[in-house]
Amino acid sequence: MYWCKIAQTNEEYEAIARLNYETFVEEIPQHEPNTQRLKIDRFHQENTYIVVYKKTELIGMVAFRDQRPFSIDEKIGKVERFLPKEVCDKVCEIRLLAVKKNYRTGRVLLKLTQALNTFAYEKGYTAAVISGTTREEKLYKQMGFQQFAPAVGTKNAQFLPMVLTRNVFEHDLQRRLAKDDYTFYPGPVKQVETIGYTNLSHRSLSFKAIYERVQQKLLHLANTKHVGIIVGTGTVANEVMLAQLQAQQLGKGLILTNGEFGERLRKQAVRWSLDFDVVEQEWGTIFDCEKIALLLKTGAYQWMLVVHGETSTGTCNDLDGLSQLAKYYKVKLCVDSISTFGAMPFSLQDCYLATAVSGKAIGAVSGLAFVFSQYLAQSAPTLPAYLDLANYQQGAIPFTLPAVLLGNLDESLQAYPVRYEQLQQRFEALLQLPYMHLQLPTTRYPMLITIQLPNALSNLHIDLALNGLLVHGDSPYLRERGFLQFAVIQPDFEEALVRLNEMLHYYEQIIEA
């Protein structure tokens, strides 16, 4: 297996110095020989090295540097003189592209190209320049580089100033390289089947049949009486839920938060001018039902709002326990089940209102939101029409509902109840991988695993991306806490798991954590 990472250990830096010597002293006579057979680059402290491995053997490298002057500036003058102005906003230099002689194959080239482009793109560079040797001109062109200035150097070591622009990457290389990518995102979900129903009207009888079938399936999975299907995101679903609380003027509520999405609910509730208190727990810790019972016992609260599956930490809050408290103290329980709905079987029977979406565990295209209720909502003239739950419960389809979304959801729902077992098995398989012992100590649900990275693994997120393994860690709330998330809901999970397991197996032999 060939795989790439950002160099970070002393052993890697020594291997880089050896390869640097073999390539740029012995093979290409740029520097004087020495007895150590090591060549440390003059910009070593400023370089970021991407290295390529064959299992655990370092076989190739490339260096990035964005501090001026570039070495190519010293050869031809400032590169901006030769490049179009629009590509000069953020330029980096790529140097020291080297691969051991025995490994100069198309597979290694492709792996380095993928890693090089991913790194440059993620860092926001508009162009990457390189001094390419004339003997490897074909190789550089295969990687997307184009000559932009006359050749320079000596007869024995002649170089071509070459550039790879962000525009070339986006319009030529990105799609080709992304074919080998696997994602472990908790949404959106990759679609492998052709999207149909592109010409079906939402006013047709055929559409109505699909709509009713989807409604019944959702109601069966949720064990509720009513569901509104809305074009929108989970945020829209929660707006509709909160709008009901505001329109009904139910009184004071209690909002429970122990993560990012509980906090978002609280902020939305503030915008609706709802009257409520907050029970705030540390991220990743579950709520103490005894303490909540003491609060409800006062009789001060008429409703309670909680996130069932707190995606930011992978915490599954105790829905059964909270439901029992709500019933006992006659409090209306409202639940954000966006992350858990479709991931495991549970009942929303005792929930006054609950929300879910199409593009999470269910595995359908993102774009449809669901609001479940145990009652038939009354029209609320004070609410915006789009956020009035009653409009979605009158039997008619009040607003345009794309058939492509509904048809895709219908097909995804046909996987139930078998999908529950599939996700559980995937979840258990994921737990066996290296580094999963770093998962947060919390109550889990079979949708995603959250690990907290020690300093030694600070590059793991980008290192996985360099190899086409895309995991969830870009959100600010995840970056701030060093969280990395692996979800099990993508259609090609089994194939992705094999590659992830293989890479992590070698990775842990290089990086101790």
PLM regions with names:
Residues M1-Q30, I40-E46, E57, L97, ...:
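Terminal substrate-recognition subdomain of acyl/acetyltransferases
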Residues M61-R104, F159:
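Conserved acyl-donor/pantetheine-binding loop and adjacent beta-alpha core of acyl/acetyltransferases
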Residues L177-L205:
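N-terminal "arm"/small-domain region of PLP-dependent enzymes with the aminotransferase-like
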Residues R213-T224, Q414-L440:
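Conserved PLP-dependent catalytic core of the aminotransferase class-I/II
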Residues T224-L254, G262-R266:
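Conserved beta-loop-alpha segment that forms the PLP phosphate-binding cup at the N-terminus of a helix
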Residues F287-S337:
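Active-site phosphate-binding strand-loop segment of PLP-dependent enzymes
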Residues G359-L431:
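Active-site C-terminal subdomain of aminotransferase-like
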Residues T442-E502:
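Conserved C-terminal alpha-helix-loop-beta "cap" of PLP-dependent enzymes
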